A protein has these predicted regions:
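Redox-cofactor-proximal catalytic regions of oxidoreductases
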Residues: 177-256
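N-terminal Rossmann-like FAD-binding beta1-loop-alpha1 element of flavoenzymes
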Residues: 135-159
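Conserved redox-cofactor binding core of oxidoreductases
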Residues: 93-125, 233-331
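Glycine-rich loop(s) and the adjacent beta-strand/alpha-helix scaffold that form part
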Residues: 164-169, 174, 202, 345-350, ...
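Single conserved hydrophobic/aromatic residue that forms the stacking wall/gate
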Residues: 414-425
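Flexible, low-complexity segments enriched for small/polar residues
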Residues: 2-101
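Short helix-loop-beta connector
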Residues: 130-133
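Short, hydrophobic/aromatic-rich segments at coil-to-beta transitions
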Residues: 338-342
Length: 425
């Protein structure tokens, strides 16, 4: 079956990407097979493998000639049948990943874009000694766990447990970054329409691999949270807002840390020509001259970026021996509704750690999973996840743009439903 799947991949790939040479096609095929072997949701891959198996037989050419394969994939994506749309979306997403990434380094597609190419680097995992007990276990070292560990560390003995590793202080390529600093190699997707779910993994969590965008939660959203949770002015209270003030001050969140790079000058001009106002996005950096964040999502080290690791887990603020990297929390032991132990996997060995208190801040994907695996039962667990999908838009310009250069998101605007862009730059 694997040989037939590979045969179908080569036929479809050559039709969708006719300019790729043989070596580039082979690299893409290797990564495609890597996805098939490592995709978290096996049920999502089964349908695709069956279709590819059937597609490999010669009878297919009677109905779908090679030259018509691109149109066939487009028709799948726009089909009225949800199963076919799902198949078309899945094929497009996985083929796209196969061109953007490579097991040998940078994806083949970037050779055509004058894109900076970086070789695979290495991660040196630290040996950690898992304790028998800890007063407070904070699970997750990102924006939630980082704040919690920082505050609680003033009063309690805090152990920080993180699924990922420390950063390597290198500028990494895309494949290496996704494989080492994101959960499930950065290939996990939603069912149905294949929205890629990128969950940061490593000391600092998402704060170590994001673009440093630091937007405060708007008042209207805080009011919505109060309404949804039945709270009486909790999220919109002065106390809650002072907590945000504290975090923003500690991380040095400021619009002065952002500058409009060449790639967004045209966007700013277009907004101005259409009488649309825009604002500069504040960033959490300690140096206004830190203006390169194109590779920060792949673990690029920059001491100016104020991740939770830099701000709150430095040796002068947090006991380094209480930071347990590369530890996977399997579940919690419960007694009378209270967590008494956490079950921690490290280097293939399962450890049971006694705890007085647990702060579970493993992200919106893993937090409910750990609760479910621990025996918690609630109709909302594992449901009601809301995403804000991001879509890329490409433009052709007379001048070279280098979209990976400079800070990434620089400005934002509120475009209402009745407003349209009328004038061209």
């Amino acid at each position: 079956m694997d040989k037939r799947i590979s045969k179908s991949f080569r036929v479809i790939f050559s039709s969708l990407y006719p300019n790729f040479n043989e070596e580039e096609a082979k690299n893409s095929e290797k990564y495609f097979n890597f996805i098939l072997a490592n995709f978290p949701d096996r049920s999502e891959i089964t349908l695709l493998k069956i279709v590819f198996f059937i597609f490999s037989f010669g009878i297919r050419k009677v109905f779908i000639k090679d030259k018509n394969i691109p149109r066939f994939v487009q028709n799948l994506q726009s089909s009225n049948l949800s199963l076919l749309r799902k198949l078309g979306s899945g094929m497009t997403a996985l083929f796209g990943l196969s061109t953007a990434r490579s097991l040998d380094g940078e994806g083949s597609v970037y050779k055509y874009l004058d894109y900076p190419i970086y070789k695979n680097t290495t991660i040196e995992k630290k040996d950690v000694s898992i304790p028998k007990s800890i007063e407070v276990a904070v699970i997750g070292s990102g924006s939630g766990g980082g704040v919690a560990a920082n505050i609680l560390n003033e009063k309690y003995e805090v152990g920080l447990f993180e699924k990922g590793s420390y950063g390597n202080g290198e500028t990494n390529n895309e494949t290496f970054g996704y494989h080492n600093f994101y959960d499930t190699n950065g290939i996990q997707q939603t069912r149905g329409y294949k929205v890629l779910l990128l969950a940061g993994m490593g000391i600092g969590g998402g704060t170590s691999v994001n673009w440093t965008t630091s937007l405060r939660t708007p008042d209207k959203i805080l009011s919505e949270w109060d309404s949804l949770t039945g709270q009486d002015n909790y999220f919109n209270s002065s106390e809650f807002k002072s907590s945000m003030d504290y975090v923003c001050k500690e991380l040095n969140v400021d619009v002065e840390n952002n500058r409009i790079p060449q790639k967004e000058e045209k966007l700013a001009q277009g907004l101005e020509l259409n009488d649309l106002s825009y604002k500069i996005i504040p960033r959490n950096t300690s140096n206004a001259d830190c203006t390169e964040s194109g590779f920060s999502t792949f673990g690029r080290y920059d001491e100016s970026i104020n991740s939770t690791n830099k701000v709150w887990f430095s040796e002068d603020k947090f006991e380094p021996n209480n930071v347990f990297s590369d530890t996977n929390i399997k579940n919690l032991d419960l007694s009378n509704g209270k967590a008494t132990h956490i079950n921690v996997e490290n280097n293939g060995i399962l450890h049971k750690v006694a705890v007085d208190k647990v702060i579970l801040a493993a992200g919106s994907l893993n937090t409910p999973k750990i609760l479910l695996d621990s025996g918690y039962r609630n109709k909302h667990l594992g449901h009601n996840l809301k995403l804000h999908p991001v879509s890329g838009v490409a433009g052709k310009f007379s001048d070279e743009q280098k979209p990976w250069a400079g800070t990434m998101p620089v400005s934002y605007t509120h475009l209402r439903a009745h407003e349209t862009v009328r004038k061209r730059v």
